[in-house]
Swiss-Prot record:
Cofactor binding, note field: Binds 1 zinc ion per subunit.
Protein name: Protease HtpX homolog
Annotated Gene Ontology cellular component terms: plasma membrane
GO molecular function: metalloendopeptidase activity; zinc ion binding
Xref: PANTHER family: PROTEASE HTPX
Pfam families, sorted: Peptidase_M48
Source taxonomy: Bacteria, Pseudomonadati, Thermodesulfobacteriota, Desulfuromonadia, Geobacterales
Keywords carried by this UniProt record: Cell inner membrane, Cell membrane, Hydrolase, Membrane, Metal-binding, Metalloprotease, Protease, Transmembrane, Transmembrane helix, Zinc
Cofactor (UniProt): Zn(2+)
EC number(s) given by UniProt: 3.4.24.-
Gene that specifies this protein: htpX
Family (UniProt): Belongs to the peptidase M48B family.
Record-annotated membrane-spanning stretches: 6-26, 28-48, 140-160, 176-196
Gene3D superfamilies with a match to the protein in the record: Metalloproteases ('zincins'), catalytic domain
Amino acid sequence: MNRLKTTLLLTCLTLLMVAMGSAIGGRSGMVFAFFMACAMNVFSYWFSDKIVLRMYGAQEITEAENPAFYGMVRRLAVQAGLPMPRVYVIPSESPNAFATGRNPDHAAVAATQGILRILTPEELEGVMAHELSHVKNRDILISTIAATIAGAISMLGNMLQWAAIFGGGRDNDEEGGGMLGGLAMAIIAPIAAMLIQMAVSRSREYLADESGARICGNPLSLANALRKLDSASRMLPMEEARPATAHLFIVNPLTGGALLKLFSTHPPMEERIAKLEAMAYRPLR
């Protein structure tokens, strides 16, 4: 299922970029955009995880640098039947964490300095088990590619606005789609980016919560961690967070009103906590 979702995401990106090329440069623009999209798809597959980690200034750590945290991840990886992922720390006081990579053999988990400070060892174990569940369930590729694609589409939308304003007088079919086509694509592009992010199903968070609770063996530890993170992340939002990558994190790093909640890629926190608390009163299989 995740392979199908990844293919659909890449196809959507290709079609959108071809449409953008047509709006700006007609048939020649379509051809150029098609080859550019193909190159971006290959680049996203191989390098999107590195881009996301660099975007947040994540620093890879060794066991010697942080034996407690590194050892915790290694122990949980063994319990989950996974290869040892690379471990990163993000220099941010806002408490959060995410997983990224192509597959279990090329995976990384990252946690902020803030989450390492405010959670108890048991709560942190629940959070990292959740992130390793994304690796085990192979959510990480589609999540990371979605982040790269959404960011690229938003950037192209901004470029199209300027192109439509300063170069949109042409209306020849061969040379360009004109100002109206460029403006239309500038409006469509950010909406498409939002829809791509929403395509990364909310249900994967529920599954990662459940799988993570089974890996660490303590649903209440993860429930308590989510409750604490939900409160702390609102009081101390991640200033460097970007909408294109918000869906990667265990809790939404963005702050906003009802509209943000409506289009959030994360399920309601109270529902996630309730499901975990219900798990605590039945045998874990």
